[in-house]
Every structure is written in structure tokens, then in C-alpha cells.
Amino acid sequence: MRFLFLHPNFPAQFWKISQALAANPRNEIVFLTAREDGSIAGVRKVLYKTAREVAAQTHPYLKTYEQAILHGQAAYRAMLEEKKRGFYPDVIYGHSGWGTTLFLRDLFPRARFLVNFEWFYNARGADSDFDPEDLPTADDEARLRIRNSSILVDLYSCDAGSCPTKWQHRQFPSEFHSKIEVLHEGIDTAYFKPAEPDAPLVLGKNGLNLSELPEIVTYATRGMEPYRGFPQFIEAVHRLLAARPNCHVVIAGEDRVAYGAALPDGKTYKQELLARFPLDPKRVHFTGLLPYADYLRLLQASHAHVYLTRPFVLSWSVLEAMSAGCLVVASRTAPVEEVLEHEHNGLLVDFFDVEALTATMNRALDERSALTGLREKARQTIQVHYELRDCLKRRVAWMNRQMK
């Protein structure tokens, strides 16, 4: 069979499924993307480039929609050339929201059209109005409604959709629920596993030897931002280090905003927070983005791993931490509660309660031996519900059903 995957950021959510399908020599796998670097054995990349940037005069509500249309237009043009060369997919599987999915149904009308749906924007009841000090304005509400435009086109156009979690599935309009199946991408538990006894845990990127640190709190994020509880975490770390002279904190991620709004004065949240809550650079280690092997060592060395999120998309990182046997201290928010139960396989705190977060990190460090069972149950949760092999089987079976 011929499969066409669509995502501007290769390989993104389609890494493992495209890799698995490419292992079958009877399949032909094409991946349309805007990202030049990276490769997967047996997967042929086709590149596209948008014709221009979003116009400065475009109405603010329409900027994300215009951006999606530009991606969709470029995707169509790139695949038109492939069609002229004889490529016609049996299955198209794209990620909604970016725009690459918008027009290819028209170019390949006989193909089964599958879409991965990650998030539907709502001004009420999820992330947007979660912070009482940062409620959406009328402009925000209007912008969010229009931001769903390209997603709604995909919901209408697709033959079937997938969504990684039940929480994320609930964000979509109820009339489309039957069209979307909950299918997580899966976690490689054979890779994300606890360290062997006495294994050296050195971050190759900067030579930091985690094996030598007596107490380690870890935090991993794409961006240092309010959506992932970075302000609460830094304030809690400020308090924690004052009480624990032997504690070290290792923070992986970039000093940028991945989700939500940046500060209006041009400062990063890291800059602002470190000015308010100074931290000892000898005990707080900002590693930047880590290579996969170093990221695994970070999780394996952790004595307490903190994951905070607004009611938004659930990060792979918390599932990877659970698979690696981390003692996870996380926010008591809906996406987290789908995978973590307080005192069963992790410890939950109120997202905004810095005092409770500090106390829970203290407890995690004080009671490391007593809380070993939570680590074991966290890994078991991933093995039972999110094991990569099982998730791939379910996804392939779902894709096969769409061909009937």
C-alpha cells in the first residue's frame, strides 16, 4: 500500500507509525514536510515551502488561518508534482491545524483521508480561562473561535480521525466525537526504563555527572512558560533550595514560549523569574534541549520529576518519565489525572499552590525509599496502557478498518 504522511515538522507524531509501516517491503511511505533534516529508513521525504509569510495587514483573527492556507497551498503544489510522476496514495494521514491537510483530499479523492486531531480551542472550560488572573478577552474569544477554522475543515473532510487522549478528545464538538478514535502514539518502554544499578549517568552535552548528586529534582519542557507551570516551579525551587543545601535541580528545555503568550516587554519568563527568585547556578542546572540519550539519563537520575500543565495537551514527557520509573510530582489537572492517580502512581498538587508543590517535592526527597511503589506503579501504568508495540498495533488495525 501507499501511505502519505503530512506534518511540517518531520517526523513529529508520525515517527513510529511511519517507521513501522516502512518495515513492510510491500508498503511505499512518503512523508510531506517542510523540515529538511532528519530521515527514517524506508521513508521518502517530499519537501514543500510556503510561498510567503502571513501578510502584515491580515486581520489578527485570521493570521493562523492564513498561515494554514499557505501551508495547504504549498503542500498541494508539492504533491501535484508527485502525482504527475505517478504517485497516488491509498491512505493520507495528516496532522490537523497546520494546514497541510486542507486541500489534498481534492488532489487525491480516491485516497482514504485520515487526520490526527490534537486540540480544539475553547474559550471556556479548558486552558484559556484556567488562570483567574489571565482570563480571555473578547478579542481572545473571537480569535480562538476562528483559529478552529482549519481544524473544522479537517473534521468535515476526513474519513476518520485519531486523538491521543480522552481529555483531548472531549475538547472537540460532540457531533464529531464518533468520527475520532482515541489512539495514543505510544511510549517505548524498552528504551524509557529505569537505569541499571551503578550505571554512570553523565550528560554528554555538558559533562554534568548526575550520579554524584545526592538529591535531584528534574523538570523537562519544550518551553519555559506559564502553560507548563514554569513560574510556580521556579518559585517552589527557590524555597526548596533554601531548605535543602544538598539538593540540585536539573531543568531541560529551551528559554522560549512554546504555548501561550510571550511577555510584552520582550523578556523571557526565565529572565523575569530568576530576577525575582534568584537560584544558585552551582545547584540549578539549565541544560537546554538534550539529545535523546542524555534526556533518558536525566529521567533515570531523577529523585523527583515535576510536571505541571494547564488543562491542555498532555506531554509525552510525563509518560516517558513514568516509563523510566520516575517519582512524578504533577499538577492535579484533567489531562494529568487521566494517567496519574494521587498516592497510587504519583503525587498530585494544585497547579497554583506553590507551597504545596514545595512540600510535595520535600516529601518526595525525604521519603524516597517509602515511595518506591509509586515509581513501580507509574512504569506499570505505561506498560499496560501506553506500550509502543500495543499502541502501534491498535493504530495499524484502525487504519486497516478505514480501508474496508
Sequence positions of predicted segments:
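Acceptor-binding helix/loop patch of EC 2.4 sugar-transfer enzymes
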Residues: 52-62, 110-149, 190-201, 211-212, ...
